[in-house]
């Protein structure tokens, strides 16, 4: 039986007149900015336009962005705050080897455009020459490992992460990577828009070869090699939809089995170069793509192999070299693929670089200055209330059997919650920041991160480690540790407002909390037990009922025409759509329960319920370029914000 969910926004239709008479002081208390609304729209017909139309009109996309929304604006504010912290350090001398010296010096190196342009492509010249002078196929495998340590990834990647069948322990794992355009569809699909991007990529590769000194003939030859290698890889790669099956991505092999299954691949040289020579087993994520990589490595003529690896170096280093390289890199990856019109100013790129290479060092400074203890305390209460409400929803699910409910509630009760920042900060004492070149420092930063990662191989998982920096405007659920994490960076307006009442905060950050919790029970998360192991805890009947309900959501998002002739991918975005839908419902239930004893007043003509839904929709206010719509349809597991707010509020769906 289909049950129609129309969450209670109908009252908007009766009160649109009152919505335009708020006072500024009341707006701050309510958390709703009336300038963000479009009161000419009917909320019962187009709630997204009503809630976000004013904001979209007043916030056109800046030239340096492919899309511009709440996440972007908050990230911009954070970046300005971080800029102030970093520039203060960069303005003075510090003890050599101190965090202050590393942060300040790296920023100055990235900002020094005079030196970058004077050096040109010299920082990668020796590496280019080495790759162009390969004498023996055996040396390629060691080179692949050395390059990965420096952040240059070709063919395949090895990493250390939780063993999904034994989540308390770390294991070495392989994963398909290496396509320069990111998604296999750009190599395989032949519609006009995709073909146009592919042709632009060919021109880009040729131009980049020439910028580092190749003549036209050699550059054109390089283009053909890159397209041949990456098209062959793309044909063997799993799609993003196929990658959503965690069981298919788990194929543990002993070193002996690896050598048997991929006999031409020099595993000893590769693992040794990655500082993993003692590893005796690897979890292979996608055996077919690894097989394709092994075949190409074994058969591609050595000269062509060198050309391809030179391209991977050029592609990885481009943004750290002179203006000509950085601008050409931007022209394809941002302007062509996403529609971005201008490169970000250098200071923004410098802040992003420092915040990435020395993430927790920057994060520690950030939270000390900008994250109040009261914000963490209020978040703890919100999380607790949403956890209780999700538990109540699970207990009341008519379609789920008792035995599955018991397991679901056990999993919910064991959520590991992280808020704001880690209790222990990373130690960057062994990372060297020197004044040689931007690229050399990025290589050392990547080598430092690699060493930190491989040191975990075969050791217990540290459940207190954070997978995001505190300054990040995002949140996550990690199934292998059964944790939800909300960095300090996202705990600000419009997601969280210490000056707004619960109606606003449950509608904004409350939905984000509910979203991450629901991930523990989406199409992927539900396959992991309370301990983070890939283990089926559902009865066959309950799993079937879940799949039936999930298919309804797939069908809804498949039917959305996001651009003329281009439709959403309901299967690829299923996990995020389930989390968005569940997060909204859980947050609303928690909000009603939290305010039942002391109902909130009407503010500015808005009921508490209306403020809740306006806060929710306001989070998704976003302007986006047509090119980025097409790009995200191929690459992003998240649906566009417009459809999230419209569908999850008003779309009929099976009871979840």
Task: Enumerate the language-model features and the residues they cover.
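Structural recognition of the beta-strand scaffold that forms the well-ordered cores
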Residues: 46-49, 173, 483-485, 520
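Short, Gly/Pro- and small/polar-rich lid/capping loops
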Residues: 23-35
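Intrinsically disordered, low-complexity linker/terminal regions across diverse proteins
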Residues: 226, 261-264, 283, 287, ...
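Active-site-surrounding "flap" and adjacent substrate/cofactor-binding loops of secreted or lumenal enzymes
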Residues: 42-45, 50-110
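Bacterial N-terminal signal peptides that target proteins for export
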Residues: 1-7
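C-terminal motif of bacterial Sec signal peptides marking the signal peptidase cleavage site
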Residues: 17-18
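Noncatalytic, helix-rich "gating/capping" subdomain that lines the substrate-entry/channel surface
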Residues: 89-381, 385
């Amino acid at each position: 039986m289909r049950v129609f969910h129309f969450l209670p926004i109908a009252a908007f239709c009766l009160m649109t007149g009152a919505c335009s008479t708020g006072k500024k002081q009341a707006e701050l208390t309510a958390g709703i900015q009336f300038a963000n609304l479009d009161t000419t729209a009917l909320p019962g017909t187009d709630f997204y336009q009503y809630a976000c139309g004013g904001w979209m009109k007043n916030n056109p996309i800046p030239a340096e962005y492919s899309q511009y929304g709440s996440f972007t604006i908050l990230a911009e504010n954070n970046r300005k705050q971080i800029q102030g912290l970093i520039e203060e350090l960069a303005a003075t001398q510090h003890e050599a080897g101190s965090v202050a010296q590393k942060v300040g010096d790296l920023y100055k190196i990235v900002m020094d455009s005079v030196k970058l342009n004077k050096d040109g492509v010299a920082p990668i010249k020796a590496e280019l020459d080495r790759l162009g002078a390969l004498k023996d196929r055996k040396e390629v495998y060691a080179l692949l490992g050395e390059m990965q340590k420096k952040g240059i990834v070709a063919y395949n990647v090895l990493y250390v992460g939780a063993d999904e069948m034994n989540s308390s322990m770390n294991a070495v794992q392989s994963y398909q990577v290496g396509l320069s355009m990111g998604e296999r569809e750009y190599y395989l699909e032949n519609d006009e828009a995709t073909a146009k991007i592919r042709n632009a990529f060919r021109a880009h590769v040729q131009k980049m070869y020439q910028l580092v000194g190749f003549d036209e003939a050699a550059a054109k030859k390089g283009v053909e090699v890159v397209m041949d290698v990456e098209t062959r890889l793309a044909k063997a790669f799993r799609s993003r939809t196929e990658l959503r099956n965690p069981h298919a991505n788990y194929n543990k092999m002993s070193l002996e089995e690896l050598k048997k299954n991929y006999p031409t691949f020099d595993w000893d040289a590769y693992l040794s170069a990655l500082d993993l020579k003692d590893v005796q087993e690897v979890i292979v994520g996608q055996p077919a793509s690894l097989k394709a990589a092994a075949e190409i490595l074994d058969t591609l003529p050595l000269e062509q192999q060198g050309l391809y690896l030179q391209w991977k170096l050029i592609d990885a280093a481009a943004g750290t070299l002179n203006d000509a390289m950085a601008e050409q890199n931007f022209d394809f990856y941002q302007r062509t693929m996403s529609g971005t019109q201008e490169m970000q100013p250098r200071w923004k790129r410098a802040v992003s670089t420092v915040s990435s290479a020395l993430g927790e060092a920057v994060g520690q400074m950030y939270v000390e200055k900008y994250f109040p203890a009261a914000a963490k305390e209020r978040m703890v209460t919100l999380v607790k209330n949403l956890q209780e409400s999700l538990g109540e929803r699970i207990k009341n699910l008519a379609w789920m059997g008792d035995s599955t409910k018991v397991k679901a509630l056990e999993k919910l009760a064991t959520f590991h919650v992280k808020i704001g920042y880690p209790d222990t900060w990373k130690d960057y004492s062994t990372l060297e920041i020197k004044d040689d070149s931007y690229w050399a420092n990025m290589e050392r930063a990547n080598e430092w991160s690699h060493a930190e990662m491989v040191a975990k191989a075969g050791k217990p998982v540290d459940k207190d480690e954070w997978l995001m920096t505190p300054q990040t405007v995002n949140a996550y659920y990690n199934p292998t540790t059964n944790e939800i994490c909300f960095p300090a960076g996202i705990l600000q307006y419009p997601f969280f407002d210490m000056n707004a009442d619960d109606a606003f905060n449950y509608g904004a950050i409350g939905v984000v909390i509910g979203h991450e919790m629901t991930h523990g029970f989406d199409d992927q998360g539900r396959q992991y037990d309370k301990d983070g192991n890939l283990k089926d805890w559902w009865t066959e009947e309950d799993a079937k009922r879940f799949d039936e309900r999930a298919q309804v959501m797939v069908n809804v998002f498949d039917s959305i025409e996001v651009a003329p002739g281009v439709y959403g991918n309901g299967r690829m975005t299923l996990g995020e759509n389930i989390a968005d839908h569940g997060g909204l419902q859980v947050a609303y239930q928690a909000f009603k329960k939290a305010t039942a004893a002391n109902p909130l007043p009407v503010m500015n003509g808005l009921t508490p319920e209306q403020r809740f839904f306006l806060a929710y929709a306001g989070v998704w206010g976003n302007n986006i370029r047509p090119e980025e719509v097409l790009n995200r349809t191929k690459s992003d597991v998240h649906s566009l914000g417009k459809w999230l707010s419209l569908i999850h509020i008003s779309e009929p769906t099976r009871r979840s």
